[in-house]
């Protein structure tokens, strides 16, 4: 079976912990992330076979009720997405940069996955709602045309749920901004 990740984002920390427990009991999945995020929300990320992740997310979504911010089941995740969440994927030289900012972690991760599958870009980072008011953003680097395409695809993905905050393409970033965006 294919591997997948599932994400559940809630407005309540207590409800998030309750949902996480129920999700893990409902299906054979691995807990990848369970933590508070700004502003007082709770994030759960699970991994496993597609069917198991779908079952766990369905359980969590049902339990979350009106405290659900967003959810996602992402089968066959691109290999660069999880490293970009954990830290940074390295980029050798200064290139065009694209940034897509969303209102939810799930929307951003889905957008990042679609962008790197549709374009020849490096997914440099995915910053997940810590210290930025609960928003999430992704940074891609590459040739201008590829970055434009990636940002368009990612923006359309986040926009489908009404969760796009803003998008930007910087064709020739200043060296200081480049370092900030790709080195953290």
From Swiss-Prot:
Coiled coil: none annotated. InterPro entries: BMC_dom, BMC_shell, CcmK-like_sf, CcmK/CsoS1_BMC, Micro_shell_prot_PduT. One of its GO terms (molecular function) is 4 iron, 4 sulfur cluster binding. Seems to be bound by a single Cys residue from each of 4 subunits. 3 ligands are provided by each trimer, the fourth ligand could potentially bind another protein. The cluster is accessible from both sides of the trimer. One of its GO terms (cellular component) is bacterial microcompartment. It is found in: Bacterial microcompartment. Pathway: Polyol metabolism; 1,2-propanediol degradation. [4Fe-4S] cluster binds at residue 38. A minor shell protein of the bacterial microcompartment (BMC) dedicated to 1,2-propanediol (1,2-PD) degradation. Overexpression of this protein leads to cells with either deposits or having lamina-like structures in the cytoplasm. Not absolutely required to make artificial BMCs. May selectively transport specific metabolites. PANTHER family: BACTERIAL MICROCOMPARTMENT SHELL PROTEIN PDUJ (PTHR33941:SF11), PROPANEDIOL UTILIZATION PROTEIN PDUA (PTHR33941). Homotrimerizes to form a pseudohexamer with a large central pore, which is probably the binding site for the [4Fe-4S] center. Interacts with PduS. Originally suggested to be a homotetramer; this is incorrect. Belongs to the bacterial microcompartments protein family. This is Bacterial microcompartment shell protein PduT. The gene is pduT.
């Amino acid at each position: 079976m294919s591997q997948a990740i599932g994400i559940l984002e809630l407005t309540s920390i207590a409800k998030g912990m309750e949902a996480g427990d129920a999700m893990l009991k409902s299906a054979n999945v691995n807990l990848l992330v369970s933590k508070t995020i700004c502003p007082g929300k709770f994030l759960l990320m699970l991994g496993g076979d597609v069917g198991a992740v779908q079952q766990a997310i369905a359980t969590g979504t049902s339990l979350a009720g009106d405290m659900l911010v967003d959810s996602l089941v992402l089968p066959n995740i691109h290999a660069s997405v999880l490293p970009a969440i954990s830290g940074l994927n390295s980029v050798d030289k200064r290139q065009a940069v694209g940034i897509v900012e969303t209102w939810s972690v799930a929307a951003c991760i889905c957008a990042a996955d679609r962008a790197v599958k549709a374009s020849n870009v490096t997914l440099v980072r995915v910053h997940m709602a810590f210290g930025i008011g609960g928003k999430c953003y992704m940074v891609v680097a590459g040739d201008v045309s590829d970055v434009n395409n990636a940002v368009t695809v990612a923006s359309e993905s986040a926009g489908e749920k009404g969760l796009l905050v803003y998008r930007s393409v910087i064709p020739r970033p200043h060296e200081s901004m480049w370092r900030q965006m790709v080195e953290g």
